[in-house]
Amino acid sequence: MNQEEDTVNLQIFVPELNVRKFLAVTQNDFIWDVKRKLLATLPQALPQAFNYGLFLPPCDGRAGKFLLEDRTIRDYPFTDCVPYLELKYKKRVYKMLNLDEKQLKAMHTKGQLKKFMDYVQQKNNEKVEKMCSQGLDANFHDAQGETPLTLAAGIPNNRAVIVSLIGGGAHVDFRNSEGQTAMHKAAFLSSFENVKTLIELGASPNYRDPIGLTPLYYNMLTADSNDQVAEILLREAADIGVTDMHGNHEIHQACKNGLTKHVEHLLYFGGQIDAENVNGNSPLHVCAVNNRPECARVLLFRGADHLAVNKQGQTALHVSHIVGNPGVADVVQAHNPKSSVPYRGTPQYSTRRRLSSTITRRRSMSQSSICSQDVYRTPQSVRKGPMSAAPSPSPSRSSRTTITPSEYGTMRRSGMDSMRGGGMIAAGHETNIARILVIPRGVKGFGFILRGAKHVAMPLNFEPTAQVPALQFFEGVDMSGMAVRAGLRPGDYLLEIDGIDVRRCSHDEVVEFIQQAGDTITLKVITVDVADMSRGGTIVHRPPTASSRHSLVFTPTPSAIYSSTKASSVYRMRFDTHDAHGVDYYAPNEIRNAYSESRHASVRQRPGSGRRISAAELENLMVRQRVPSVQGSPYQMQYDQESLNGGYSSKKYNSVSDMKRRKGQRNVVASSAGLNRSTFEQAAPTTSTFEYNCSSRSTPQLSRMDSFDSFDDEDEMPAPPPASYISPDLQRDSSMQRSEYSRPFRPTSRPKTPPPPPPMQHQNHQNHQYQQQHPSLPRSASTPQPIQQQQSSIPPPPPPPPPPHCEPTMVHVEFTPPSTSSVPPPPPPLPPISSGAPPPPPPPPPGGLMHVAASAPVLMSNSKGISADALKSVQLKKAEPRETSAASVSNNNNNNNNSTTDFQMDLKNALAKRRSKVAHDVDEDEERESRFEGLSLRETVRENVVERGKGIQNIGIVNKKDSGYTSSRTSLEPSESEEKDHRPHFSLDHSPNVQRVTLISQHLEDNYGQKDNMSVASSSTASSSSTVDLTKPGCFVVPSHVIPPVDYDDDPDSGTGDSDGEIRCSEISFEHKKVDVWSVDDVIGWLSSLHLSEYTPAFRSQRINGRCLRQCDRSRFTQLGVTRIAHRQIIESALRGLLQ
């Protein structure tokens, strides 16, 4: 059955809110999941929402009824084109024809209801049946929050009353005020007769309470539990592998309470013998802690791993000695793994229950699927439960879908389970065989966590092997998501995305491919057989995390991957003298931060396919479109676009002191903030090898736009290859790069021009590179020979300040034979600059672009920024109309070279049409474009900066939005609200009357440095960064306090309700104070630097200053709203670092 036939459009009406909703669900969706999806979309929360049910009104002579929550949509055939349901509070459905409303009202007084509860308590079956026959509705709560059915289920051997209640209209799944059903109550109290009666009357063994626990789990919570209750629940196909908020399974609780027979039943019906909780403790560890030698003996006899270690590196034997339980230690020491006898038979289930699509035959996989040799692992259930995530802040996590490879049996999936997956699942689900999965996008995304090597900037000597077939793998899979239904399992390696080979791609590239997918995504994955996997050099067994505690995850070691902390464009280059030093992986805390609050994986698609693009994005796009065609000329260094757009950065610091320490270790020369940065490292083609990694795809490189990570001012870009090594296709592709994780911006107005001509002969390589670094200077006709002789020993001269002209003029650079020219050649290189003397001013650009006072020196210092004196000397040319701009471009081209070809003119004209004036607003998206050469005054100096008195504003760059077009989050489940995003943003202003100055200087470093995810790309650049001098030519550095930083707002307000300037000031001030003297604003700024701005309202309302912050403990942080352990640990760790 195809996807369209499986989809059902439901029309659901909510009478309490007078709301009508339309939901598209599949035939295999459980009623419980449909109800939860509906409750999440309601504008107002309903009280006791767990007691609301989907009601099917009477139709075609059939009485209305509430749909059972443990069944699927397929079990309820609908006759209408658009099935109609109602979400109503569960009440008795009367089938009597002669109803007297007055009599019913008299039956439901407080006195009558109290009397009815007394009859239930006294087991007076006749009275209960009589009152129900008179029309009393048994679906109500007493003063203690109990229902008549839950009260009756708690009384031993109360079969008659239970039958009378359910026969009298009581819903079997009606919950008490704590969200527990009668089945939960009977299982907890080990009332075997009551559990049996409820099951016979149609109750499900898989009801969930608000935290997702089942009756089977409840049965393991007491030491005097009856094993017959567990057995009958398991025979009715109860879910196994349900965990609480601490990650404890049923078998953990059974071992804790010494329930030996329960452990036997759980193992026989497929329980995971070596399941781990959040601390990494297996059931054997629990036996060691609680001194349960009998349970430990059963576990070892059935194949438990006695060498399994927890997250503290302790085995069960270690734990038993530490706690002081010699009984368990003796059992473990005396155990011989060869004597283990695991269960190998298939369990028998009850034939009375209809095992249809409602309850899948999840134990169809043979129970002989046990791990090889002395490590035995019982197989997991293939069945996906209907309610793996409960509507509570502490959702349950089910691990029963993890499949362990085996040498004894072949893993098989039942046909019904394959139907429920909804995707193309390979028959048999064998290991080491690639399979194709088609995963539809659900409400929470696709439902997986991707993990692997990040930011591959250099070519990898990685060849896929049988053990490590790809760089990216799936760390976790949402047990209630679409991926697990399609057959995806934790630990699977990703081979292809929509037919594109991604085995050697970095994490960012793969994320972009996933984000570009539509409503469905086709993945080619493979499950690696753990038993055949080598434990040596190429595989690392990563410790289990909260999202994949029960799956073996293997990762390529750093030795197999080059250092990949800097993003490349299309090419990836490798220097022969460089060594690989490691690779970055997504840590669990980074994954949680990146995906907000949720623990299930998803890659969200930004709403709206045709979203507007911000000015900063256009600026960076135009900068990247400046692809050099001159042989040997370097690429211009790209702007920190991801930081400007407020995109998430994967590099985090544990504390402010850690940030400062690590920044100090990487203290390299910084390029002038906001200026067009160029690299001066010249690598000869003979000493470097450039490799290009282009994935095969059916269309030319248009869809692939590599993401860029933030470049710190102190990082150096690896030298890009000469243009002679770059094919025209690659050059075109490099102009299409982007830096967002969101839906890619696909420009439709891209000028359709032929590729640039092949470069001329390799001559004057050094001079060409110098001219490309200064595109505003026309090419000299001849270059003095001593320049090339001195290049090896004398540093190249510093670049001049960029011409701050307002018109988007284009400078044409061409290779021409040496001839006489009136344009003066560039001056010879300057001698080395001493530490105390400033360098001489650089050569001026041609006249007409800008005017610099001859007396204004270019200051240099040890900090970053632009000096005020340098800014005073800048005189800007006034803006000209668009026609004048186009004419000037044409005139310049004609003056430079008369032999310009037609396609070059077309290219320049097309590019000129895409650019607008800096200080004029024109129509919406087409006209909101900016300079392409990195010389825009939005990045350096605004127009008419001499009148800075009315332009400079002390506005911080923190908490600024980019008109809502910031980078998407690379989340499990990212937050939908843009208003709650407190991460730094940067935007550009197009107002024609505002004159401002932007210095992306030390403040940017302080703010975005905490999110720095870049490091030196190779060993050579790392070594050079430690010896470079801050007075190196080509870098303008002045104290950051000369001119206060401002930013350009697209939005008048950040939307947070707080003053951005106050937050900025607080971030500056708290770093120079002791914690004891911190004010409330200092604490708020400190929290913002830790990316924990969501707690600032509570800290501000409680007036938490530095002294109070030092006295905060766990309970105090909880009162302030810091309930997440990871966030509290970040705060405490950072605070300890400051105090030390």
Swiss-Prot record:
Subcellular location(s) per record: Cell projection, Pseudopodium; Cytoplasmic vesicle; Postsynaptic density
Bias type Basic and acidic residues, positions: 977-988
Name this polypeptide is given: Protein shank
Organs and tissues of expression: Expressed in the pharynx, pharyngeal-intestinal valve, intestine, rectal epithelial cells, tail neurons, nerve cord and sperm.
Region (Disordered): 337-412, 640-673, 687-856, 875-902, 961-993, 1008-1028
Disruption phenotype: Animals are viable, but produce a reduced brood size, have a prolonged defecation cycle and a reduced pharyngeal pumping rate as compared to wild-type. Reduced male fertility which may be due to irregular male mating behavior and defective sperm function. Reduced cell surface abundance of the L-type egl-19 calcium channel in body wall muscles, which results in a 20% decrease in Ca(2+) current density. In response to the nicotinic acetylcholine agonist levamisole, there is reduced expression of genes such as gem-4.
Record PANTHER family: LD13733P (PTHR24135:SF28), SH3 AND MULTIPLE ANKYRIN REPEAT DOMAINS PROTEIN (PTHR24135)
Sequence ranges of the ANK repeats: 144-174, 178-207, 211-242, 246-275, 279-309, 312-341
A Pfam cross-reference name: PDZ
Compositionally biased tracts (Basic residues): 351-364
BP terms from Gene Ontology: defecation; rhythmic behavior
Role played: Scaffold protein that most likely acts in the postsynaptic density (PSD) of excitatory synapses which orchestrates synapse formation and maintenance at neuromuscular junctions. Associates with and trafficks the L-type calcium channel egl-19 to the cell surface of body wall muscles to ensure the function of the calcium channel and therefore maintain the Ca(2+) current density. The maintenance of Ca(2+) also allows for the downstream regulation of Ca(2+)-induced expression of genes such as gem-4.
Domain PDZ: 436-529
Biased composition (Polar residues): 640-657, 687-704, 964-974
Residue ranges, compositional bias (Pro residues): 794-806, 823-847
Tagged with keyword Repeat: yes
One annotated GO molecular function: synaptic receptor adaptor activity
One GO cellular component term noted in the UniProt record for this chain: dendritic spine
Subunit relationships: Interacts (via PDZ domain) with egl-19 (via C-terminus).
Tagged with keyword Nucleus: no
Family to which the UniProt record says this protein belongs: Belongs to the SHANK family.
Miscellaneous comment: In contrast to the mammalian Shank proteins, does not contain a SH3 domain.
